[in-house]
Amino acid sequence: MRALPLTIGTIHFVGIGGIGMSGIAEVLHNLGYAVQGSDISDNQNVRRLREAGIQVMIGHDAANLGTAQVVVISSAVGRDNPEVAAARAKLIPVVRRAEMLAELMRLKWAVAVGGTHGKTTTTSLIAAVLEAAQLDPTVINGGIINAYGTNTRLGAGEWMVVEADESDGSFLRLPAVIAVVTNMDPEHLDHWGTAEAMEAGYQQFVSNIPFYGFAVLCIDHPTVQKMIPQLSDHRIITYGFSPQADVRAERINTDKFGATFEVVITDRQTRRTRRTPPLRLPMLGEHNIANTLAAIAVAVEMGISDSVLQSAFASFKGVKRRFTKTGETGGITIIDDYGHHPVEIAAVLRAARQAGARDVIAVVQPHRYSRLASLFNEFCTCMNDAGTVIVADVYNAGESPIEGVDRDSLVDGLRTSGHKSVVPLPGPEHLAEMIHAIARPGDFVVCLGAGNITAWAQTLPEELATLQAKSSKIRRTGSGG
């Protein structure tokens, strides 16, 4: 891997504990650069970086800069941050996270994966395929890849796979050779302003690929399909379940452990088709089959064999917080999932049904007041696959409250939209007792959100088991008396 000039000095990351920032910091550290950083609080990413030998300071203070010669910030870091202000006062370059990622991407041939949903899993699947093909890729992902125990991988090969962040438009800076778009639903409109502006951003993202590159687009998504005529000067490959898709899944058989399917691949120029042998994916949900099709589209163009695909997918270990089982007690399964957009929530709850749940109990922690406000009607209608919905307070993620947009308004909205069983969660300390009162053997409890609900999902199995043991003891005592 060609190096950046070694004279750039120590690189300081403000907000290094974020998933995107931590990945770039770890890759630069593994390349031999002096890396340090700060974050407002300790978390798993901070601990992982420290274990790797990276100094991380808790809290933001001008003194944290030390001898840093470059400062990297995310879009969440404001100009009034004391470290950023100190860097500018010292005339130290301050670069955005996406700019630093773009510099790393220039050292390789890059695949960038964009979309409202499915980016992290699709990035992980492409990485798994390239690794199985012995292409030794470098990977920078937006979630922890279970096979790595981290969200990054430094490879010696010529290819890099990255998750492209559309939230602040910074994915337009990324110099990708292959651009993947999984879907486009209204999201991050606080940055884009309108859905039309967001769609134009995605079109620019794809248009940025060079003439020797190509775009991989999900034709099943109407907004993505609408973009195709505007890309006539670029090479594209479509995927999905539609008969119009160049890479199409057929003969799908699902069970509670995953899916087996075949893929029909059509050459856009010759219209010749071929069929792959059966592929096994140990993941639930039609949306994950779609993510796999995106990886197959990339692999086909890179000349990777079907046998490599079979091996890569069959051994795929998934991504942290993507339908992750945290425990099972008394026949009740606890699932932790990052889903926080209505489309994601609906897909995860469908997957729980597919897994053979007797019933599904959704525990939802809305993430950001602005998201709940802009997608309120969608939130009120996306949970029909849950027999019961438990709604927690909004995780504000630094936002100020919006009047009339809160836990209780969502509870009322779900009920008004026809959901038969919706209850507010007074606080996380009451979750286990509520689940104990509602859940029965065979049920799935699915904890959904991008906030601290993941911590609740981790402790819930043990808390629930304790309550079950107490109830069992009381029943035995009662029957014996």
Curated annotation (Swiss-Prot):
ATP binds at G115, T116, H117, G118, K119, T120, T121. Pathway: Cell wall biogenesis; peptidoglycan biosynthesis. GO terms for molecular function: ATP binding; UDP-N-acetylmuramate-L-alanine ligase activity. It is found in: Cytoplasm. One of its GO terms (biological process) is regulation of cell shape. It catalyses: UDP-N-acetyl-alpha-D-muramate + L-alanine + ATP = UDP-N-acetyl-alpha-D-muramoyl-L-alanine + ADP + phosphate + H(+). InterPro entries: Mur-like_cat_sf, Mur_ligase_C, Mur_ligase_C_dom_sf, Mur_ligase_cen, Mur_ligase_N, MurCDEF_pg_biosynth, UDP-N-AcMur_Ala_ligase_MurC. Its main location: cytoplasm. One of its GO terms (cellular component) is cytoplasm. Its EC number is 6.3.2.8. Keywords: ATP-binding, Cell cycle, Cell division, Cell shape, Cell wall biogenesis/degradation, Cytoplasm, Ligase, Nucleotide-binding, Peptidoglycan synthesis. SUPFAM superfamilies: MurCD N-terminal domain (SSF51984), MurD-like peptide ligases, catalytic domain (SSF53623), MurD-like peptide ligases, peptide-binding domain (SSF53244). Belongs to the MurCDEF family. HAMAP family: MurC. NCBIfam families: murC (TIGR01082). Cell wall formation. This is UDP-N-acetylmuramate--L-alanine ligase. The gene is murC.
